[in-house]
C-alpha cells in the first residue's frame, strides 16, 4: 500500500509568490500539522520575530489543495491564554474547511534548560507553565470563534 505522509510545520518556509516550489512536497502530503503561535499579526511578530503572513498563506494553500490540517496552538499564560485570543484564533482558521483537528497545547518550561545550556536567551523567561484545567474552556473558545466566523462568511455569500 501507499505510505501516508504528515508534514509538521509552522509554514514559515512557504513562499506565496512561488507556491509551485512546494509542489514536490505538498503533492505527496496527506496531512499537515500546522503550528499557529498567535492569532494577532503584531503580537505574533513580537512573540516569534516573524511576520505571520507566510504562515497564513501556507494555510490558504493547503486549504486550496484540500490537504487535511490539524491546527496546533501552544497556550502561553499572559500571552495567548484568554478566551478573546482563542476566539480570534478560531476566526482566523474558520475559512479553512480542511481543518480536521485542533490541538491546544499547554505551555511548559521543559525546554528552558536547553536554551540555558546553549547560552541562547529564552524569550519566555519567567513565564509559568499553563494551567491545564483551563484548556477545555480555551479550546471551546477557538471552536466558538470558528463557528461564528463561518456563519458570518456563509451569510455574506448569501
List where the protein language model places each region.
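Auxiliary Fe-S-binding modules of radical SAM enzymes
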Residues: 77-158
Amino acid at each position: 500500500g501507499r505510505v501516508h505522509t504528515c508534514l509538521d510545520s509552522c509554514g514559515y518556509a512557504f513562499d506565496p509568490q512561488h507556491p509551485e516550489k512546494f509542489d514536490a512536497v505538498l503533492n505527496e502530503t496527506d496531512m499537515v500539522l500546522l503550528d499557529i503561535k498567535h492569532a494577532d499579526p503584531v503580537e505574533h511578530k513580537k512573540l516569534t520575530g516573524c511576520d505571520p503572513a507566510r504562515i497564513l498563506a501556507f494555510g490558504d494553500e493547503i486549504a486550496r489543495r484540500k490537504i487535511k490540517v490539524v491546527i496546533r496552538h501552544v497556550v502561553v499564560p499572559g500571552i495567548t491564554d484568554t478566551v478573546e485570543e482563542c476566539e480570534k484564533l478560531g476566526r482566523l482558521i474558520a475559512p479553512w474547511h480542511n481543518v480536521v483537528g485542533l490541538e491546544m497545547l499547554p505551555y511548559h518550561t521543559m525546554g528552558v534548560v536547553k536554551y540555558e545550556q546553549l547560552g541562547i536567551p529564552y524569550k519566555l523567561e519567567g513565564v509559568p507553565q499553563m494551567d491545564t484545567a483551563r484548556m477545555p474552556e480555551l479550546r471551546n473558545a477557538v471552536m466558538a470563534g470558528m463557528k461564528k466566523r463561518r456563519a458570518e462568511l456563509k451569510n455574506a455569500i448569501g
